[in-house]
UniProtKB/Swiss-Prot annotation:
F(1)F(0) ATP synthase produces ATP from ADP in the presence of a proton or sodium gradient. F-type ATPases consist of two structural domains, F(1) containing the extramembraneous catalytic core and F(0) containing the membrane proton channel, linked together by a central stalk and a peripheral stalk. During catalysis, ATP synthesis in the catalytic domain of F(1) is coupled via a rotary mechanism of the central stalk subunits to proton translocation. Component of the F(0) channel, it forms part of the peripheral stalk, linking F(1) to F(0). One of its GO terms (molecular function) is proton-transporting ATPase activity, rotational mechanism. The keyword Iron-sulfur does not apply. This is ATP synthase subunit b. The gene is atpF. It comes from Buchnera aphidicola subsp. Schizaphis graminum (strain Sg). Belongs to the ATPase B chain family. GO terms for cellular component: plasma membrane; proton-transporting ATP synthase complex.
Length: 163
């Protein structure tokens, strides 16, 4: 094989082309590739950190939710206890008031019964006296009734004094 000028020219132009590519084209391409690799690595690292932070935040959030549930449960239990205490107090107060009202009404009833009895007794005494007076007027001459009437009047007057 003969080395002629064409092969030498092609070899020289190929060497110049390779040198030109190595000098001016490859460095920006390599730089862009390296920059993109760094960006991808940084993104992956930040993604891992974000996932770890997310896990930590979720744990904290779950803990806060659990604490809140416990506090809410405690508050509800305390409110229920206070409610039952207030209801018991109200029941006891209402029972005491009902007893007082019952006693007051019972006293009023007893007082009215006594007044009615007095009035009834007074009316009976008045009617007895009136009947006795009529009998006396009708039978004043009869001695037989005099003793009975005097006895009745004396007993009625004694009863009247007792009232």
């Amino acid at each position: 094989m003969n080395l002629n000028a064409t092969i030498l020219g092609q070899a020289l132009s190929f060497i110049l082309f390779v040198w030109f590519c190595m000098k001016y084209i490859w460095p920006p391409i390599i730089f862009a590739i390296e920059t993109r690799q760094k960006n991808i690595e940084e993104s992956l690292i930040s993604l891992k950190k974000a996932e770890e932070e997310l896990i930590i935040i979720q744990k904290k959030m779950n803990q806060i939710i659990q604490d809140s549930k416990e506090k809410a449960s405690f508050i509800i239990n305390e409110a229920n206890k206070k409610k039952s205490i207030i209801l018991e107090d109200a029941k006891s107060i209402a029972l005491e008031e009902s007893k007082k009202i019952f006693l007051r009404n019972q006293l009023e009833i007893d007082l009215k019964v006594m007044q009615v009895r007095k009035n009834l007794h007074k009316e009976i005494v008045d009617l007895s006296i009136l009947i006795a007076e009529k009998i006396i007027k009708d039978n004043i001459q009869k001695d037989q009734y005099k003793y009975s009437i005097k006895k009745l009047i004396v007993s009625l007057s004694k009863d009247k004094k007792l009232i």
